[in-house]
């Protein structure tokens, strides 16, 4: 109960953990008792749970501003994200599901060190490593598996639990946060971008707004094809003039306040859409 945001909240409430069997019923009960008409989530691990319960909330007059299961599956699973981007004709870093696959790619000079190893269903840079040799890569893989086993991510992949790690080329260059906004029916609204100047614990610490038609084109393709609901937080890297989409999160990201301060009031848009 010590999150900084609570200083600005009207009420402080401690809910059970998202893995608690009573989590949804407690949220529903609290929302009804306090006449809450809409709920958003900032937690990646909560999205799959909420997306499967949208009808339950709608039946009691509450709108969950959460995308459907298809969208959450694509954005929560970084491998499925890569496959979706490929289908859209968009650039993304070369990505591999196994140590054997990336070792083969390195042997064939299709990729070179330094590489990135991270959890397939990770969040906030959990478990990310940057090995610079084969030995480091093997050791980092074992370390990440151990870290995953000690967190809630150990159950995130379901039947894919054996492929919990992704291996990826490291793209050096400018990094951007890109918000792709759809309305509550999944219709594309706009794309808003900020260049990240510094990071802290996986979140944007300093940034400047960017206006660039290349991002608008990418955002429109993603928003139109994905048909997510509300804000989609994307990480984009630039190398040699080309843009690579790294990740997509079907929620507000830590960099949203920068867009808000520059005049993009997405929260206000939500309220307007909810009021009809």
Put a short name on every predicted segment.
Residues 141-224, 237-238, 242-244:
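Phosphate-binding site of ATP-dependent enzymes
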Residues 13, 34, 200-201, 210-276:
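ATP-dependent carboxylate activation and anion-phosphoryl transfer catalytic cores
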Residues 31, 106-108, 223:
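Short hydrophobic patches on amphipathic alpha-helices
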Residues 38-41, 93-95, 166-168, 233:
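Short catalytic-loop micro-motif centered on adjacent basic/acidic residues
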Residues 1-66:
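ATP-binding N-terminal substructure of ATP-dependent carboxylate-amine bond-forming enzymes
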